[in-house]
């Protein structure tokens, strides 16, 4: 490989579980581009030094994952509208010697939902979002942008209220125990919690309460099909698996470093699915 070929990364702590190297190196190979993408483990106390010295380390940019996204936002010289709105960065790049940051999570969510459930926006009812972490914030922003009324529920209500306040109280916050009533009129259900992930407790929800035309999106992709998605499919509901968001948020980031917008193909999806299945 050419010594000057661009190098990009995904940084987190821990990071061994990341599928991002599979995704980006697949695109580099398929597009015939010189470059390399690698996982880098950086502990929180060392992150600022890492991010502020990317060029010296030979990187053109990279992805940022837990627990560094909010810290990254505070370190960039320039941030996109999406990053400023979410106060978190998942994509870094160097431009004219300055560190830039973006957040592609909202875009990734919408692309995945549009792909899996075309026409979902026309379904009446509110979007019920479960959880109050960084992913929930990005998804609430995306749904507001599409003109959707959002109902937000989290096991710790105060965290959901903090997200609602961030968006000018646009999402309506409800107690977790009130979810059954909210599901009865929901057009979209999105799980952003870790419930249902391998090694975590299940998400105890009755999808039979949802209207027959509702769509269910679970951002958990380990396992590829959660119990929530299986139950929704069994009822005949349309579902959007979590892997789609992971793949689609990666595409605009790749374009920042390698100047080409890649496509999310069935072949790429199968490649990542196979890697996840091996780890289950």
Swiss-Prot record:
Species classification:
Bacteria, Pseudomonadati, Pseudomonadota, Alphaproteobacteria, Hyphomicrobiales
Cellular component, GO, one term: cytosol
Give residues annotated as binding NADP(+).
131-135, 154-159, 219, 242
Pathway it works in: Metabolic intermediate biosynthesis; chorismate biosynthesis; chorismate from D-erythrose 4-phosphate and phosphoenolpyruvate: step 4/7
Say which species the protein is native to: Methylocella silvestris (strain DSM 15510 / CIP 108128 / LMG 27833 / NCIMB 13906 / BL2)
The biological processes this protein is annotated with in GO are:
amino acid biosynthetic process; aromatic amino acid family biosynthetic process; chorismate biosynthetic process; shikimate metabolic process
The EC designation for this entry is: 1.1.1.25
HAMAP family recorded for this chain?
Answer: Shikimate_DH_AroE
Which catalytic reaction applies to this protein?
shikimate + NADP(+) = 3-dehydroshikimate + NADPH + H(+)
Q: What is this protein called?
A: Shikimate dehydrogenase (NADP(+))
Q: What does this protein do?
A: Involved in the biosynthesis of the chorismate, which leads to the biosynthesis of aromatic amino acids. Catalyzes the reversible NADPH linked reduction of 3-dehydroshikimate (DHSA) to yield shikimate (SA).
- Assembly and partners? Homodimer.
Gene label = aroE
User: Any keyword Oxidoreductase?
Assistant: yes
């Amino acid at each position: 490989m050419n010594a000057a070929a661009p190098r990009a990364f995904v940084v987190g702590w821990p990071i061994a579980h990341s599928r991002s190297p599979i995704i980006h190196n697949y695109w580099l190979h398929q597009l015939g581009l010189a470059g390399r993408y690698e996982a880098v483990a950086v502990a929180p106390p060392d992150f600022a030094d890492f991010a502020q010295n990317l060029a010296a380390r030979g990187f053109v940019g990279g992805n940022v994952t837990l627990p560094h996204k909010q810290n990254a936002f505070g370190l960039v010289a320039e941030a996109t509208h999406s990053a400023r709105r979410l106060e978190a960065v998942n994509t870094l790049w160097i431009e004219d010697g300055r560190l830039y940051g973006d957040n592609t999570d909202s875009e990734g969510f919408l692309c995945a939902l549009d792909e899996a459930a075309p026409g979902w926006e026309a379904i009446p009812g509110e979007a019920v979002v479960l959880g109050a972490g960084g992913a929930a914030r990005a998804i609430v922003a995306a749904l507001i942008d599409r003109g959707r009324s959002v109902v937000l529920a989290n096991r710790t209500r105060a965290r959901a209220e903090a997200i609602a306040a961030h968006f000018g109280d646009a999402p309506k916050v409800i107690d977790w125990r009130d979810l059954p009533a909210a599901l009865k009129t929901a057009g979209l259900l999105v799980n952003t919690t870790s419930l249902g992930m391998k090694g975590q407790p299940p998400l105890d929800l009755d999808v039979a309460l949802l209207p027959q035309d509702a769509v269910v999106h679970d951002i958990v992709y380990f396992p590829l099909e959660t119990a929530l998605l299986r139950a929704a499919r069994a009822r005949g509901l349309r579902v959007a698996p979590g892997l789609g968001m992971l793949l689609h948020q990666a595409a605009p980031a790749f374009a920042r470093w390698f100047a080409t917008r890649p496509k999310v193909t069935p072949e790429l999806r199968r490649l990542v699915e196979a890697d996840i299945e091996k780890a289950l």
